[in-house]
């Protein structure tokens, strides 16, 4: 879907005095949609945590999700505020933030779907600059990680609530005609961002970002067995190591430049640091001018 369509679907302004509001377009509209998503996500996670009285781990995960969404909202620059906090007399305020799904499985799927929505936009150099892609991509990947953590705690699949999430999306679309903004996930049913790493394209060979990512994946793969021994908490280290080596081979066969070294060292071997290093290498590809490289980075990031 084109950015024009996406921007038009970001939110509908109230019919009364709508023309008095400044017009959002381009990345400004996309950014505000992402910010509204985080605001809705934080509010719903807080509400769900308050009622999760029979599951302490669930409540804790939900509060963490709410805190993460709030942090991402701030990193995105907050909600659009054209009037500086006080709406002038006779002028219209931006539409209220629509609510996120109330059912946990639908909420988790909604988090994941809105994340891939934003990641697809970030992966398209025709829609986002390098800096815009980094900003939007960071929010999208953080939201996807929140969805994955909640799915793990609740023991459900990310896609378990897809149908319910789409139903909520349809209801919000209908309400948007009355001045409520839409989540637009229905526009991204056929996402170009794949959770399967299969890069292709003529730009891969010249991409310094992909080459650096390959080196990072390879170094992490060779360090994981040692990390498992030293940390004692990485039970899947060997499996992840094998998957990373397969990814390295896939990238090299697709044309990535090989800058691996026979010896490499990582500053930290704990799970959080290793994961952070991987995601940083993946996300760096979103700053590329090549759609092929950005798509490779987005796919790798979803996997990691």
Where are these regions (language model features)?
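Sec-dependent N-terminal signal peptides
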Residues: 1-8
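C-terminal motif of bacterial Sec signal peptides marking the signal peptidase cleavage site
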Residues: 11-15
